Amino acid sequence: MIIVDTSFWLALGNRSDKYHDVANLYLDSLSERLITTHPVITETCYLLLDRLGNYAQCNFVANVAAGAFDVFDLEIHHYRRIEELMQKYRDLPMDLADASLIVLAEHLGHGRILSTDLRDFNIYRWNNQNPFENLLLKT
């Protein structure tokens, strides 16, 4: 499974996004399932509605409902780790969506991610030491 950040969903949904074409090409070539978290879904819906309108938000929600990708369920015990991460990365600062993806990486045992957020996901470490591997924007 490949972890997906909000920025990937936004690139897919916005034809004028500079990463739109590369995100679509990557999506078309996938042989693995995608997985994200509820905080990422919430953030994506908010930003799609704000930037592109209700149709874009509803289209994304329809894909969630259709099972186009998996959704990791955060449990109460995960929030202790999320709070630790928010404290650790407070200078960025880190939001709930990004912290939830680190928890997901720790759960999966890998940091393979699709994101256009180069700054944050080049800094974040899962299990406090392992860097993320951004499959979308490999350099």
Which ranges hold each PLM region?
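Acidic, PIN/NYN-like endoribonuclease modules and their adjacent C-terminal/linker elements
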Residues: 1, 108-139
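Short, well-structured N-terminal submotif of metal-dependent ribonuclease cores
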Residues: 1-36, 49-61, 131, 136-139
